[in-house]
Amino acid sequence: MARVTVEDCVEKVPNRFELVMMAAQRARDIAAGSPLSVDRDNDKNPVVALREIADETVTLETLRNSLIKGHQRVPEQDEPEEEIVELMAGENAWSVPEAGGDEGGDASELLDDEGEGAAAGAEPDFSEMDVPLADLADEDKI
């Protein structure tokens, strides 16, 4: 940035922090398509914004208002109560089924790897294993 431009701007806006905020807002406005009031001369948007402030081709009050408007937060509006009532009505569909009902399922309906039903509490059959359990215990040094 040209030092002369910044020094000229400090005369117009004595607070350097406010100057930076106003120049940044004007640079954003330029990037958004706002028309330029000075020639670009192959300068970037922040430099053009500072030149506009130094030449007083933009009003400082307009920049302040634009800056304030850009930083204000609009509170979110609450959802209408009708939607809440519908959501609460939908909670009934998620209710837990009765203990004796058919919907709950049973542990005896679970299938093992071969697709056979596993009885609840039944011991697994290890006779089909290739390595005896005693050999596995020796390997792990248990």
From Swiss-Prot:
Organism: Rhodospirillum centenum (strain ATCC 51521 / SW)
Annotated function: Promotes RNA polymerase assembly. Latches the N- and C-terminal regions of the beta' subunit thereby facilitating its interaction with the beta and alpha subunits.
InterPro entries, per database record: DNA-dir_RNA_pol_omega (IPR003716), Pol_omega/Rpo6/RPB6 (IPR006110), RPB6/omega-like_sf (IPR036161)
Keywords, comma-separated and alphabetical: DNA-directed RNA polymerase, Nucleotidyltransferase, Transcription, Transferase
EC number: 2.7.7.6
Name of the protein: DNA-directed RNA polymerase subunit omega
Reactions catalysed: RNA(n) + a ribonucleoside 5'-triphosphate = RNA(n+1) + diphosphate
Protein family (similarity comment): Belongs to the RNA polymerase subunit omega family.
Pfam families in UniProt: RNA_pol_Rpb6
Keyword Nucleotidyltransferase: yes
Compositional bias of kind Acidic residues: 100-116
PANTHER family named in the record: DNA-DIRECTED RNA POLYMERASE SUBUNIT OMEGA
Keyword field contains Transcription: yes
Domain of life: Bacteria
Molecular function in Gene Ontology: DNA binding; DNA-directed RNA polymerase activity
A GO BP annotation: DNA-templated transcription
Stretch list, region Disordered: 93-142
Gene Ontology cellular-component annotations: DNA-directed RNA polymerase complex
Subunit (UniProt): The RNAP catalytic core consists of 2 alpha, 1 beta, 1 beta' and 1 omega subunit. When a sigma factor is associated with the core the holoenzyme is formed, which can initiate transcription.
